[in-house]
A protein has these predicted regions:
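Nucleotide-activated chemistry modules centered on ATP-dependent adenylation/adenylyltransferase
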Residues: 2, 6-223
Length: 223
């Protein structure tokens, strides 16, 4: 999370879980962001290759992270080597105080928080969520006001540093930043038609921000 990076102390170690096998994901966009971080902030991002996401194949599932916090598995394994005291994740309010981005919950008392805070504690690490109280829209605003405003980009489907404009991330992150997207793409249409709507609060905001409310008339009463 670039927003989390901008809020955390300068001595924070920046690390990226690099999928190290052939897949649909393209790392050229994040790598350009890392280059900008080095040039504009004089900080380096530690890129650690991993095939961890293939573990799901053994269970008949698609490639992907095995749990909500598996994106930090590289840092858990290197915690002693890097002398880490904790690991921070860029989880926004849409997935903390708002359960699935739809309904309020007391996150501090939730099973999710108690379980994962406990698991990290057993490993001698603090479980840190620096933007747990900030919406995705708020996180985007933090990035817009930074030196990385032109460099930050969440798309992992683009090629040669250019975002694809067709994925869900492009819809709710690149679109609101004024970047060109295809709002009628198969993936965006599928997600907007899903019930319940994924990360509903932010999705509705993204529709309004881009004047695309007509794509989801079933939510007119919420605009």
């Amino acid at each position: 999370s670039t927003a989390a990076l901008l809020l955390l102390p300068d001595e924070t170690i920046l690390a990226y879980h690099l999928r190290d096998f052939v897949s649909m994901l393209d790392h050229s966009i994040p790598k350009r962001t890392f280059q900008a971080i080095q040039e504009k902030m004089e900080r380096k991002v530690l890129c650690i290759p991993s095939n961890h996401e293939r573990i799901r194949l053994a269970h008949g599932l698609n490639v992907g992270f095995s749990s909500a916090n598996a994106a930090g598995v590289h840092l858990i394994l290197l915690a002693d080597y890097l002398d880490l005291k904790g690991i921070a994740f860029g989880t926004p309010i849409d997935n903390t105080w708002l359960k699935s981005g739809r309904t309020f919950r007391d996150f501090s008392q939730s099973h999710y928080w108690k379980y994962w805070e406990g698991q990290f504690s057993k490993a001698g690490l603090s479980y840190v969520l620096p933007i747990n109280h900030i919406s995705e829209a708020g996180a985007m605003e933090i990035c817009k006001q930074s030196v990385l405003s032109e460099s930050v980009n969440s798309c992992l489907r683009g090629v040669d540093g250019k975002w694809c404009g067709k994925c869900w991330k492009c819809f709710h992150k690149n679109g609101p930043l004024g970047r060109k997207i295809d709002p009628h793409s198969k993936e965006i249409t599928t997600f907007l038609s899903a019930k319940p709507l994924r990360t509903a609060q932010h999705a509705l905001w993204a529709l309004q921000k881009q004047n695309l409310q007509y794509l989801a008339p079933q939510f007119n009463s919420h605009f």
